[in-house]
Amino acid sequence: MSQKQTKPAAATKAAPAKTAVATTKSKKVVKKGEKKIKTRTLFNALYTKNVKNFGTGFGVQPKRDLTHFTHWPRYIKLQRQRRVLLKRLKVPPTINQFTRVFDKNTAVHLFKLLDKYRPEEASVKKARLLKIAEARAATPKGQAAPKAEKPVQHLRFGIDSVTKLIEKKKAKLVVIAHDVDPVELVLYLPTLCRRMDVPYCIVKSKSRLGELVHMRNASCVALTGVNSADSNELALLVESAKQMFNNNSEHRKTWGGNTLSGPARAILAKRQKAEAKESLAKSKI
């Protein structure tokens, strides 16, 4: 039998020990004890990173639209609900016509004219009547009393008073507020003005009209006459009022409201998109 030839122990070469230094081609070996060094990217020292924390007790919260979460007073809540209802429901033309008002420039000229004919205050009226009474009391017997002064032109207010002036065709211009509540109080005035051929206009708002007559609010005011100096200005306002309101039949036929909310429009768009996708899939079959 042939025996295997074995080399002596001295003749065998020991394997080279692994070193940390690697060749140019091989990757650098990191020892277990050493930490891996992370390379940092260069940045401009002028701009430092500022991480914000919006938790409780930390950074100031960013500005958001918190209208939906606001706890409004009751009267404001009713105003908001009424506004939304007028947008969602179908509003008939008779009520919707009160949304059409004079433009800003025309309204400024109108209120400048009306401001000249504000009714006198109670204290001024009392002083004027007292002066007339004293003059009459001072006249001796047998002499004619001093003639009363010519009544000054001024605004007339109050629904009953304005209605009577319109029926008698004494009103030169009728001004109606757009936000009268309930609207039934002035709902018939535009029709009555057109029937009696009296120029009328709708303006913002009842509080502004109330200031003219020393009241908190006023639903409507009527101008029975003006001085000769203001006659041209009144004629221009009457012409624009007739053109926009009396002779304009389009805004009396237009329905209002009937607009969906944002979420409702999004749901409808999503539904239409799904229906279109389904019909496309059926057509391919």
UniProtKB/Swiss-Prot annotation:
Molecular function terms from GO: RNA binding
The cellular component terms of Gene Ontology attached to this UniProt record, alphabetical and capped at eight, are: cytosolic large ribosomal subunit; extracellular matrix
Q: What is this protein called?
A: Large ribosomal subunit protein eL8
Which UniProt keyword terms apply here? Answer: Ribonucleoprotein, Ribosomal protein
Organism of origin: Dictyostelium discoideum
Compositional bias of kind Low complexity: 1-24
Instruction: State the Gene3D superfamilies in the record.
Output: 3.30.1330.30
Entry annotated with the keyword Ribonucleoprotein: yes
Question: What family does the entry list?
Answer: Belongs to the eukaryotic ribosomal protein eL8 family.
Q: Does the keyword Ribosomal protein apply?
A: yes
One GO process term, biological-process aspect: maturation of LSU-rRNA
Ranges for region Disordered: 1-27
